[in-house]
């Protein structure tokens, strides 16, 4: 691909980036407001859980949120700059030492808790 094409793609991608995305990372508890279309109507659905993975790739950035629903673990991956996401709110900062928290999949109850970052 030529340099000109790369510059054009870069400019288009930068225009698509959302500017209202808060700083969050693995271990943080977030509330993601997702636009859900049901027939003619559109509503917002809140999805609250712990961020277990984050992928930073500009426009292609994504993060995975895990929550326990009816005693069953549910994970959902969101594209950070997707138009389907209305807002992201950080509810609690988690203090973790890993970038990917996949080990939480094997744990439940008290062992799946994450310490809160105090600063």
From Swiss-Prot:
PROSITE patterns: RIBOSOMAL_L19 (PS01015)
InterPro entries, per database record: Ribosomal_bL19, Ribosomal_bL19_CS, Ribosomal_bL19_sf, Translation_prot_SH3-like_sf
Keyword Ribonucleoprotein recorded: yes
Gene Ontology biological process: translation
GO CC, any one term: cytosolic large ribosomal subunit
Signal peptide: none
A Pfam cross-reference name: Ribosomal_L19
Record's keyword annotation contains Ribonucleoprotein: yes
Keywords: Ribonucleoprotein, Ribosomal protein
GO terms for MF: structural constituent of ribosome
Superkingdom per UniProt: Bacteria
Role: This protein is located at the 30S-50S ribosomal subunit interface and may play a role in the structure and function of the aminoacyl-tRNA binding site.
Family: Belongs to the bacterial ribosomal protein bL19 family.
Stated name of the protein: Large ribosomal subunit protein bL19
Species annotation: Pseudoalteromonas atlantica (strain T6c / ATCC BAA-1087)
Gene name of this polypeptide: rplS
């Amino acid at each position: 691909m030529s340099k000109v094409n790369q510059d054009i793609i870069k400019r288009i991608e930068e225009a698509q980036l959302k500017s209202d995305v808060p700083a969050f990372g693995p271990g943080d508890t977030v509330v993601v407001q997702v636009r859900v279309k049901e027939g003619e109507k559109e509503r917002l659905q809140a999805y609250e859980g712990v961020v277990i993975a984050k992928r930073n790739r500009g426009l292609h950035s994504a993060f995975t949120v895990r929550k326990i629903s009816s005693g069953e673990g549910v994970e959902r991956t969101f594209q950070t700059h997707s138009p389907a996401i209305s807002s992201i709110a950080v509810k609690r900062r988690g203090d973790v030492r890993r970038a990917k928290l996949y080990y939480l999949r094997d744990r439940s109850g008290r062992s799946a808790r994450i310490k809160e970052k105090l600063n």
